[in-house]
Structures are given as structure tokens and as C-alpha cells.
Regions:
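Active-site core of glycosidic bond-cleaving carbohydrate-active enzymes
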Residues: 13-16, 35-186, 247-249
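Low-complexity, Ser/Thr/Pro/Gly-enriched N-terminal "stalk/linker" regions
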Residues: 21-37, 41
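Non-catalytic C-terminal accessory modules of carbohydrate-active enzymes
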Residues: 124-361
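Short, solvent-exposed mixed-charge patches
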Residues: 364-366
Length: 366
């Protein structure tokens, strides 16, 4: 609008050089398992830092997993992205991320991982982590930062009290992204940027007679009004955008992980299926979907939640040099824990699994 194309060119050149430097640094720093560490090249940790803290209190995972979203440095299923997520998950506790190598829970930073799963199309894992994120919110949905010990009393340290403003912002934006988000084109290239609508749908939401909706939701492309109604054998999606000067390259609806697409009808001038998404030209207004339930994906959900808790490593305190001493986790099930049960993922199921595991761990300490 200002007509300063000279300034725009300068900023684009700077961004291109900066991205190139970051990619070179990642290639030089990535570990043998594909994990992208918390710093690039050689960086100081522990006593070498200005804070002089012990090693276990530094070098903490924070935003080093933001490799696919929103940065778009790598494709969501790139080895570095997936390996970094896998590496960080080993330090999870209570289904969320931790800080200081497992010493404390860290609620809201979990949203960073959820968004990587979201753009990778792994909506099941995104939902599991999301349900744990809100499980660790207060009665008015307030979030917290850290300073809460895993699998203990859940008392918040008064030096780090809730509610936490950034936790609220991250959670709100995450829920927004579950309804719609922009992706592609490395942010700047509008001609390669897509709009995803309802990209993460829970089995608990997709029941006959229920619906998801948004009214004048702000996006990079303007204001989006839409409604997704669930029917007996499918869904009906209506779409009424008020685009600005930009339109998305396409509008994409991801088929929920627990459904198998049978057919669809739309008034879009162009449409096709790609990467388990119905890809629609931005002129569409209606989409009718026929699908069927994939019941097998619901088998053993409760047992998987329990095994996930138990497979994570735990913080055993610092060693004699101040490094974190990690106690390896191991996935297992007790005799009364049936892995053959068919139970769709929902918040209540996650809460049930968490309470069971919490009681098991705390009762062993008495």
C-alpha cells in the first residue's frame, strides 16, 4: 500500500540470506538421530553461561522444534522435524512437555509440538497432546508456565503463578489453528499459500447432528465464515469467505484420521484429493462428503495413553557434575489393562487414563 517496493526487495533479500544461514547452521548442528538441538554451532551451557547455572538447568528444549510451523524451514515429515519431536517426547511427563530435562512440567510450550503434528497431518497425536494441554489448565482454563513437579501434588510455585498470559495466547491460537490455519509458500509467497479448514477433528466432535462453525474468522486472506455439519454417513461443509486482495491457492479439508473417504461433491471449479485432503479451488461454497468409520484406529487407545506415560524418561536429579541424570522409561501394561478395547479418543478418556496413572504413581510413594 505504501508503494515502497525497494524496501520490500531489501527485506526479501535479507530473509533469503537469513534462512540460508539458519539451514546451514542446522545442518552443522543436527545430532546423529536427527534431533535439532537447542542451540546452533557451539554454544555455552551450564557454568559457562553468564548465569552460572548447573548443566541440568540449561540447554532446555524450547522452540527448537518449530521447524515446520510456522517457520516452514522443512517439510512437516522431514527427518529433522520428526526426529526432533520424537527426541523431545522422551522427556514428556503427564502427557505434556517438561522443562529442565524433566524436572518441571511446562504446559503451554506443548502447543509448539502440537502445531508440528497438525501440519504433518497427524491429527490424532495433535489431539492427544491438546487434550493433555487443557487437562493441565485450571477451572477457568488458565494455563501455567512451569515450576510444577511431575506426578506429585500439582501445586504451583508462588514464584511462577498462573494464570500465564502467554499460555492463554498460545492455547487460544492453537484452537484457532484447529479450526483454520494458513500454510505453504514460506509465508511470503501468496500464490503458494493454502487455507486449511477444520484440519483437526476429534471423534468426540464428529457425531450425527453436531457441527463446527466459524463466523467472520480472521485469516491472511480475509474473513471466513463456515460450518461443518456431521451426518450419518458423512458431513456437509459450507464456506462463505470475504476475501481481501489475496485468495488462497486452495482451500483444504483434511479427512479425519478415523474416517475413510468414499466420495465427495462440490461446486468448486477445481477439486481433487491429495495427502488425505480434499483440495478445493477458493471459489467453492459447498462440499458434501461421504465417508465411513475406521473403527480399528480406536482399538487400544486407553492402553496406548498409559504406555505413553510410562515410556518417557524421568528426571533423577543432577549428577556430580551438574548434568541431568535421566531414568529411562519403559512402556508396559498391568494385568487389568486391556489393549483390545475399542475406545474413541476424547477428553474424558484422556482424563481417565491420566487419573489412573497418577493414582498408580502416587500410591506407590505412600
Amino acid at each position: 500500500e505504501l508503494g515502497r517496493t525497494d524496501v520490500l526487495a531489501d527485506w526479501k533479500a535479507l530473509e533469503k540470506q537469513y534462512s540460508s544461514n539458519i539451514l546451514k547452521a542446522i545442518e552443522a548442528s543436527v545430532q546423529s538421530d536427527g534431533y535439532v538441538p537447542t542451540g546452533l554451532y557451539d554454544f555455552k551451557t551450564g557454568k559457562q553461561t553468564s548465569s552460572g547455572l548447573d548443566e541440568y538447568r540449561t540447554n532446555c528444549d524450547w522452540e527448537n522444534m518449530l521447524l515446520a510451523y510456522p517457520t516452514e524451514l522443512f517439510q512437516p515429515k522431514h527427518t529433522y522435524v520428526q526426529s526432533t519431536l520424537k527426541h523431545i517426547r522422551k522427556n514428556y511427563a503427564e502427557g505434556i512437555m517438561t522443562y529442565r530435562h524433566g524436572e518441571f512440567l511446562h504446559q503451554y510450550i506443548t502447543a509448539n509440538l502440537i502445531e508440528q503434528y497438525m501440519v504433518a497431518g497427524d491429527s490424532r497425536q495433535a489431539l492427544i497432546d491438546f487434550y493433555h494441554l487443557i487437562l493441565h489448565a485450571g477451572s477457568t482454563h488458565e494455563g501455567f508456565e512451569n515450576m510444577i513437579f511431575p506426578w506429585k501434588d500439582r501445586l504451583v510455585d508462588p514464584r511462577c503463578p498462573s494464570p500465564h498470559a502467554w499460555a492463554a495466547a498460545k492455547t487460544a491460537f492453537l484452537i484457532r489453528n484447529f479450526m483454520l490455519h494458513e500454510y505453504g509458500g514460506h509465508i511470503e509467497n501468496a500464490s503458494e499459500r493454502d487455507l486449511y479448514i477444520y484440519p483437526v477433528v476429534s471423534p468426540a466432535w464428529a457425531t450425527v447432528g453436531e457441527h463446527l462453525a466459524m463466523v467472520n474468522a480472521p485469516s491472511e486472506f480475509g474473513w471466513i465464515t463456515s460450518r461443518l455439519d456431521f451426518t450419518k454417513n458423512g458431513a456437509t461443509l459450507t464456506y462463505s469467505p470475504l476475501y481481501n486482495e489475496y485468495q488462497p491457492r486452495s482451500v483444504r479439508f483434511r479427512i479425519p484420521y478415523f474416517k475413510e473417504l468414499k466420495s465427495f461433491k462440490t461446486d468448486a471449479s477445481e477439486s481433487h484429493v491429495e495427502d488425505n485432503c480434499i483440495v478445493l479451488s477458493p471459489d467453492f461454497t459447498t462440499l458434501q462428503i461421504q465417508w465411513k468409520e475406521v473403527k480399528q484406529v480406536h482399538k487400544g487407545t486407553f492402553a496406548e495413553l498409559l504406555k505413553a506415560y510410562r515410556s518417557c524418561d524421568s528426571f533423577g536429579g543432577p549428577d556430580e557434575k551438574g548434568y541431568p541424570r535421566m531414568i529411562p522409561g519403559k512402556a508396559f501394561l498391568l494385568e487389568d489393562e486391556d489393549a483390545s478395547l475399542v475406545e474413541p479418543l476424547n477428553f474424558d478418556l484422556v482424563k481417565k487414563a491420566f487419573v489412573k496413572e497418577f493414582n498408580r504413581r502416587t500410591s506407590n510413594k505412600k
